[in-house]
């Protein structure tokens, strides 16, 4: 797995749409785990020394550290609940993120002007990535990155990833790249406002303000660094990621997929049209058909810039969410074709009603604030299980119906 694929994995596991199994990942006792971890730390010094890490930095990095059981737990298990594309996009492209994205668009206008001029990456896409990765900096991760990566590195299926990124993180410390205090990030080692892994920090992070530091914990330098990353992956300046389209009856699943890419002029000749009826602006551009929920849901022709977004995270649903959130921040509307399963964003009134209904039924969710977080989703899963329906923890109008039907 190359460094770019590792970036995709590390950012993917950090997304809040996934819910992980709450099972113990320790196959041995904590004492045995600590002993094995300490042995790894001692033996890994040889690799760190070879990579140019000083003994002083190495000892400071590992002082007092033990393996992180939560990291082992998450690394050992795949997500228990996987949202279908419709629910993923609805959960990702929220009114709150759209409004906040537009506020950031105004707040950082001059900086975004300069970033877009230099790297050519659409500012709305950069803001969408920021919103998707850390909700505009509100949750950048509170894990000690050295502890997380060394925990991944000493055992488990991501040991190679953990060790390579651990060396990169130690190099960051050696170069004084980290703000005061421990290096903090996600459990998989992604850091800063736009969640770069250490190796990609070393390759792509930029010093935007010229102070001699590449500070991805600063919003502007994180946005500039992600712009540099996307530009180096082949971002096509001045072009979009794709189009929502209307399909003629004869074009269906047999035409979909990346291997069936063709020019927009050939798609038009087949009768595929943009929603709204406008012509495709560059008939020679190549695109492939993506049907996230089959022929009954929205259909998209995806261009090269969509593939570039996927260099950040390889999931189609992630890249579609980034593209759609970017369009909404720009002022665009939601998809015209409805999702076949009825997935849609809840109104504020509905969110409060779900929380109040769950409390009335005896579920513990914490404060009623209209934010459907971890506790609310856990309560929804219990409600779904009780009612014998698919358990995914996703808040929909059907949850309100379920609450109203219960005695």
Q: In which residue ranges do the predicted regions lie?
A:
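Catalytic glycan-binding domains that act on GlcNAc-containing polysaccharides
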Residues: 53-284, 297-302, 306-326, 331-348, ...
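A general alpha-helix detector
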Residues: 40-47, 111, 148, 354, ...
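Bacterial N-terminal signal peptides that target proteins for export
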Residues: 2-17
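Mature N-terminal segment immediately following signal peptide/propeptide cleavage
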Residues: 35-63
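Proline-rich, low-complexity linker regions of envelope-associated factors in Gram-negative bacteria
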Residues: 28-33, 334-336
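C-terminal segment of classical bacterial N-terminal signal peptides
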Residues: 18-30
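Short acidic, glycine/serine/threonine-rich helix-capping segments at coil-helix boundaries
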Residues: 346-351, 359-403
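Short glycine/proline-rich, acidic loop/turn segments that cap or connect secondary-structure elements
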Residues: 11, 285-300, 348-356
């Amino acid at each position: 797995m190359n460094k770019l694929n590792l970036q995709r994995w590390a950012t993917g596991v950090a997304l809040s749409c996934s819910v992980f199994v709450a099972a113990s990942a320790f196959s041995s006792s904590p004492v045995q785990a600590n002993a094995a971890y300490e042995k790894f730390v001692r033996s890994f010094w040889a690799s760190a020394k070879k990579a140019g890490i000083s003994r002083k930095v190495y000892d400071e990095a590992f002082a007092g550290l033990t393996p992180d059981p939560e990291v082992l737990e998450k690394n050992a298990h795949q997500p228990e609940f996987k949202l279908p594309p419709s629910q993923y996009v609805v959960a990702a492209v929220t009114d709150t993120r759209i409004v906040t994205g537009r506020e950031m668009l105004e707040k950082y206008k001059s900086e975004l002007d300069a970033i877009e001029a230099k790297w050519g990456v659409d500012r709305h896409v950069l803001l969408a990535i920021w919103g998707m990765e850390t909700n505009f900096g509100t949750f950048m991760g509170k894990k000690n990155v050295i502890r997380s990566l060394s925990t991944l590195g000493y055992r488990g299926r991501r040991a190679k990833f953990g060790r390579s990124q651990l060396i990169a993180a130690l190099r960051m410390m050696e170069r004084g790249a980290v703000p005061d205090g421990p290096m903090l990030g996600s459990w998989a080692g992604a850091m800063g406002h736009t969640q770069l892994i250490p190796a990609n920090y070393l390759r792509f992070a930029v010093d935007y303000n010229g102070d001699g530091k590449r500070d991805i914990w600063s919003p502007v330098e994180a946005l500039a660094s992600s712009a540099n990353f996307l530009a180096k992956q082949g971002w096509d300046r001045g072009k979009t990621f794709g189009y929502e389209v209307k399909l003629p009856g004869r074009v269906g699943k047999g035409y979909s997929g990346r291997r069936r890419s063709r020019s927009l002029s050939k798609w038009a000749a087949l009768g595929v049209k943009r929603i709204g009826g406008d012509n495709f602006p560059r008939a020679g551009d190549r695109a492939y058909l993506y049907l996230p929920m089959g022929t009954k849901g929205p259909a998209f022709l995806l261009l090269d810039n969509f593939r570039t977004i996927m260099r950040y995270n390889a999931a189609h649903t992630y890249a579609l969410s980034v593209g759609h959130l970017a369009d909404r921040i720009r002022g665009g509307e939601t998809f015209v074709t409805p999702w076949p399963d009825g997935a849609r964003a809840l109104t504020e009134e509905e969110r409060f009603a779900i929380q109040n209904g769950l409390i009335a039924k005896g579920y513990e969710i914490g404060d009623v604030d209209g934010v459907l977080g971890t506790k609310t989703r856990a309560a929804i899963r219990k409600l779904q299980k009780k009612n014998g329906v698919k358990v995914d923890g996703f808040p929909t109008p059907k949850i309100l119906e379920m609450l109203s039907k219960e005695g």
